[in-house]
């Protein structure tokens, strides 16, 4: 139940930030705006992870340095996703097959990058937490990613 409440909180708190991202035509977001949104969402994620995982001192000492690197790598992938979203928004009214194919291939590469990142970092999280706790972390991380992606997807119109 605690996890559910935390996830609902993340959605509620991130909704205004995400909703702003689709107002590209009305008021373009600056890089500084995007960075602030990312920092806010990351702080919320950190709190949810802390609350859900209830780390011991030794686990926290081993986990957070690895997670900091992992989160930075996630941010790099998120930046690529943002670039695709912006490209999509700029081309939605004039979308042709070639542009749709290009955007799809870029998103497939991003999805592959996310899975590769998770596989790469799993041994490090397992070393820090043990296999069972590392698996739990990945459950939490996956749920948080799904919530953010669902919110983004709900704000992006389908190709006409």
Task: List the predicted regions and their residue ranges.
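Positively charged n-region of N-terminal signal peptides that target proteins for export
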Residues: 1-5, 20
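Sec-dependent N-terminal signal peptides
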Residues: 4-14
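Sec/Tat signal peptide C-region and signal peptidase I cleavage site
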Residues: 15-19
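Flexible coil/linker segments and helix-coil junctions enriched in charged and small residues
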Residues: 20-21, 93
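Amphipathic, charged alpha-helical segments and their helix-to-coil junctions
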Residues: 22-26, 33-36, 40, 115-160
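Amphipathic alpha-helical segments
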Residues: 27, 34-35, 48-128
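Start-of-domain marker
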Residues: 44-46
């Amino acid at each position: 139940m605690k996890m559910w409440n935390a996830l609902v909180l993340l959605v509620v708190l991130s909704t205004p930030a995400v909703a702003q991202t689709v107002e590209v035509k009305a008021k373009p977001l600056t890089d500084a705006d995007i960075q602030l949104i990312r920092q806010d969402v990351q702080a919320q994620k950190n709190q949810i992870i802390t609350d859900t995982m209830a780390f011991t001192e030794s686990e926290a000492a081993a986990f957070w340095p690895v997670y900091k690197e992992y989160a930075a790598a996630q941010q790099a992938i998120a930046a690529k996703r943002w670039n695709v979203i912006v490209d999509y928004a700029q081309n939605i009214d004039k979308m042709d097959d070639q542009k749709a194919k290009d955007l799809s291939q870029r998103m497939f590469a991003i999805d592959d990058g996310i899975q590769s990142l998770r596989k790469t970092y799993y041994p490090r999280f397992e070393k820090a937490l043990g296999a069972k706790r590392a698996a739990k972390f990945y459950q939490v991380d996956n749920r948080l990613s799904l919530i953010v992606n669902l919110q983004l997807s709900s704000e992006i119109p389908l190709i006409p």
